[in-house]
Each structure stands twice: as C-alpha cells, then as structure tokens.
Design a protein with these regions (language model features):
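A hydrophobic alpha-helical transmembrane-helix feature that marks the membrane cores
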Residues: 1-250
Length: 250
C-alpha cells in the first residue's frame, strides 16, 4: 500500500470525476447519456470506493477516537441517515441531478466511517481483504460478461429471502453475544461464509442487470442511472468485504 494512501485515493477520485464528465454527462441541461454505459457505471463504482477509502484514511490520519465516534446516539443517527440517503438515491428522479449526487457522496462518506474501525483494528488485514474482494468481484464480473446466463433473472426473489435471513441471523447473533457476553465464533464464521456466497450471487446478478440496462438504455424513458447501478454494486462488494474480513478474524 502507498505510504500516503489518502493522496492515492484523492487522485483516484479526481480521475474518476474527470472520466465521468468526459464519458457520462451531457450539459444544457445536465444529465446522463447512454453512450459508454458500462464504462460509466464502473467509473461511478470506482468513485464510490475511492470516496469511502479516502474517508477511512483521512480519519486514520487525523486519529479519530473510536470511543467518541461510535457512541450509541451517533450510531443510531448514522444508521438512520444512511437508510434515508439510500432511499433518496433510489427514489429521487434522475432530473434532480445535483441532489442525487450530494446524497450519493454523503452515503459513501457514511460507509467509509463504518469501515474505519476495521481499518484501525488491523490495517494489514484490511488491505489484504480489499485486494481479495477486488479479485473475487473481477472474476465474477468477467464470468457474467462472458456468459450472462450463468445467473438467472428469477434468482432475485431468492436473493432477497437470503438477505432477510442474514439480517435475522445477525440479530440472533447480537442476542447471543448479549446473553453470553462473548461471541459464538462457530456461528459467526458460518454466517460470514453465507454472507460471502450471498453477495457473490448479488454481484453476478447486478452485473447482469448492468449489461441488460446498457442494451435497453435508449428505450428507457427515464434514461440511464449510473448512480443507482454503482451503489448496488458497491453495497454488494462492501458486504462481501465485511464477510471476508470477519472470516479472517474468527
């Protein structure tokens, strides 16, 4: 890892923004266009991770105190803000171009804050897991681009059921920790493997969705939505990242 990762991520943000202005946006009025659909989506995906990791490394550089940041009220407020920002990104129409970008950036900063404890706990593991996640995502994406039929369109219902199951299992895990005053490592490890598999399938499904939407873009009356595409893929990858990190920690 670069001795000054914040500089690297700042440059990556700048290059991503430059690429977006050059390839993804038209002006008068400002809006997305269908040209370079897939490339534009991945520019936003790269920008997503660059903003989140820049937030993490900036907090580390400034030595933010975990005990002061991750208090009960702050955690609740951050969780609620994160949900509201995500709903805003998904529901606000494309014509509110600047508003959606502000929500997008704020959401990524919050996601960066949630990653900060993992970075502080073990920087070497954090960097290794980041590379592992990138490799898995790249391999899965290539497989879907080569053969989109690897993943069925109908799997989304089962993925959603799986996601609800994981949420319930996490709540049960917290209850176990509360009752026993210590984590159940076997339960946690199995659950983290389930998370990795689930979000591997989500990555494949969302990659196929990107391919389909790129083909149908000019038929869509609402136009392309690179922010929504990128945030879906970002959330898939960050959940996979978390699963891999905690598997290595167990």
């Amino acid at each position: 890892m670069n001795e000054d990762p914040l500089t690297f991520y700042t440059i990556l943000i700048g290059l991503s923004v430059l690429g977006i202005f050059k390839n993804s946006v038209r002006f008068n009025p400002i809006r997305f266009h269908c040209d370079n659909y897939i490339f534009s989506t991945y520019l936003y995906f790269i920008l997503s991770w660059a903003i989140a990791l820049a937030t993490v490394t900036k907090m580390s550089k400034d030595k933010y105190d975990l005990n002061k940041i991750f208090t009960g009220p702050f955690m609740v407020m951050m969780f609620l803000c994160s949900i509201l920002l995500l709903l805003g990104i998904m529901m606000i129409p494309n014509r509110f171009f600047l508003t959606r970008h502000v929500f997008f950036i704020l959401k990524l900063i919050i996601m960066g804050i949630t990653l900060y404890p993992l970075y502080v706990l073990n920087k070497e593991r954090f960097n290794h897991v980041a590379i592992t996640t990138l490799l898995i995502l790249t391999i899965l994406s290539i497989l879907v681009f080569v053969n989109p039929n690897l993943i069925s369109d109908n799997i989304v219902t089962y993925l959603f059921i799986g996601l609800l199951g994981v949420v319930i299992a996490r709540i049960v895990e917290l209850f176990i920790i509360y009752k026993s005053k210590k984590p159940n490592n076997k339960y946690s490890k199995i659950l983290n493997y389930v998370v990795i598999v689930l979000f591997s399938l989500y990555i494949m499904y969302d990659t196929k969705t990107i391919i389909k939407n790129s083909r149908d873009c000019k038929l869509n009356p609402f136009g392309p939505d690179f922010i929504k595409e990128a945030i879906n893929l970002f959330l898939d990858s960050i959940n996979m990242f978390s699963g891999i990190y905690h598997v290595k920690n167990d």
